[in-house]
Regions:
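Helix N-cap / beta->alpha transition motif
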Residues: 9, 80-84, 132, 172
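Sequence/fold signature of self-assembling virion shell proteins
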Residues: 93-182
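Short loop/turn segments at secondary-structure transitions that flank enzyme active sites
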Residues: 12, 38, 84-86, 166-168
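Charged, low-complexity, helix-prone segments enriched in Lys/Glu/Asp/Gln
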Residues: 32-40, 84, 134-138
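Short helix/loop capping segments that flank catalytic or ligand/cofactor-binding pockets
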Residues: 16-17, 87-89, 169-171
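Structural beta-strand/beta-sheet cores of well-ordered domains, especially the beta-sheet scaffolds
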Residues: 2-4, 73-76, 113-115, 156-158
Length: 182
């Protein structure tokens, strides 16, 4: 269960502009989604006992080996720390002139072997988790996002809680591969 609570005085709610409330709710949604991403990562990392280990640093050859480890699945997504993302994007194989133009024009980053890079500060350094997002993980959700409002008259406050109940269950262990490096 993930959620956030918004507490404001009655006057602040009454006189606020709708845009501010919308922005706040959107940010609360982002916080819930970030928590669910970390829950999904924990479920995926628990499935995989071993993987590819590189003795040296991260190399393009190591990424190719990771891609090649998928038997009957496609590597569609890489869950990577910020430091490892920078290492990947600095590889000479990623510094294509046409790809650079695409990045400047659209903001889309060139990704290794067509996989989407998802970076997060909480993902561990020196570990890359690769997955086939179509069959690696199931999200089990209990209902929709729940929003509850409460008025505390004695304190003249209004509270709003936004919660989502979800869990993650691995489907096929072969759809998840892990690469660790020094």
């Amino acid at each position: 269960k993930r959620g956030r609570m918004l507490v404001a005085s009655y006057e602040a709610v009454k006189f606020q502009k709708l845009d501010l409330f919308t922005v706040t709710l959107r940010q609360i949604g982002n916080c819930i989604a970030e928590g669910q991403l970390l829950d999904a990562y924990a479920a995926l990392i628990g499935v995989h006992d071993s993987g590819i280990t590189l003795e040296g640093g991260l190399t393009y050859a190591g990424l190719v080996d990771l891609w090649n480890a998928f038997e009957g699945f496609n590597m569609t997504t890489l869950l990577v720390s910020a430091r490892d993302t920078a290492s990947i994007l600095k590889m000479t194989e990623m510094q294509d002139a046409i790809a650079g133009n695409d990045f400047h024009a659209t903001g889309r980053v060139v990704t290794p072997l067509g996989a989407e890079l998802i970076k997060h500060k909480m993902f561990p350094d020196n570990t890359i988790l690769a997955l086939d997002r179509t069959c690696a993980l199931e999200k089990v959700q209990a209902g929709d996002v729940v929003t509850d409002f409460d008025k505390l008259i004695d304190r003249q406050l209004e509270r709003a809680s936004i919660t989502a109940i979800a869990g993650f269950s691995p489907i096929f262990s072969g759809a998840v591969q892990m690469l660790t490096h020094a």
